[in-house]
Design a protein with these regions (language model features):
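Fe(II)/2-oxoglutarate oxygenase catalytic core
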Residues: 1-185, 189-217
Length: 217
């Protein structure tokens, strides 16, 4: 895999002490039933990696190793297109607005009123200008976005749900159907990604290398 994913100039810094030190994303287990990798089985909602920390990841590479006969696809949604599709009123109203992001590693969607004292969480701008493209993206995702700051709970929930519909509109989503040997890379600051479910009796394994990020504001 390492020979296939040599970093081009300006691509950023891979996380981990070695470029070959990549995360195995799989639901496979060893003979004793212990997990061999991370991010196990099943559907995973749209998200941007580590949106709930101060410096979200910049990008990622995924390399297909073991692919189920159906499902286990990776979807990508354009945050530029999502921003373009927002009502003009919202672009003005929320131009300086922040969204609180949090995540529960048990895969549970956190409640807007959840106690975050022992959870990873961070506030990110709703709109973000990508320094490479100069384009504005809508940095909001179903998996991690908890609440819109300075809004009442019910209005925040309502607007977030409407935003999720915009970011997940099939017109701006690409769905990658994996084959062994596929190598996919993406900009974590300009698109969201998600994972579809697959049969429980089948395995799925991919290698991931992540590019370290920075602050969005």
């Amino acid at each position: 895999v390492a020979e296939r994913v040599q970093a081009p100039d300006g691509a950023g810094t891979p996380l981990g002490p070695e470029w070959t030190n990549m995360l195995l994303i799989t639901d496979n287990t060893d003979d004793e039933g212990e997990a061999l990798g991370a991010l196990g089985h099943g559907e995973l909602w749209f998200h941007s990696d580590k949106a709930y920390i101060e410096e979200p990841h910049r990008g990622s590479f995924l390399y297909g190793i073991e692919i189920p006969s159906q499902g286990g696809h990776t979807k990508f949604s354009s945050l530029y297109a999502a921003y373009d599709n927002l009502p003009d009123e919202w672009k003005t109203r929320f131009s300086d607005t922040f969204v609180m992001h949090g995540y529960d590693y048990n895969g549970i969607k956190l409640d807007p009123d959840a106690d975050l004292s022992n959870r990873l969480h961070f506030r990110q701008p709703m709109f973000f200008v990508n320094p490479d493209s100069g384009r504005t993206g809508l940095f909001v995702a179903r998996l991690t976005a908890m609440r819109i700051e300075d809004l009442e709970r019910e209005e925040s929930i309502d607007i977030l749900n409407r935003i999720f519909d915009i970011t997940e509109d099939s017109a701006i989503v690409y769905e990658h159907v994996w084959r062994p040997g596929d190598l996919v890379m993406w900009d974590n600051w300009s698109c969201l990604h998600a994972r579809t479910d697959w049969p429980e009796d089948q395995n799925r394994a991919l290698r991931r290398c992540t590019i370290e990020g920075g602050r969005l504001w």
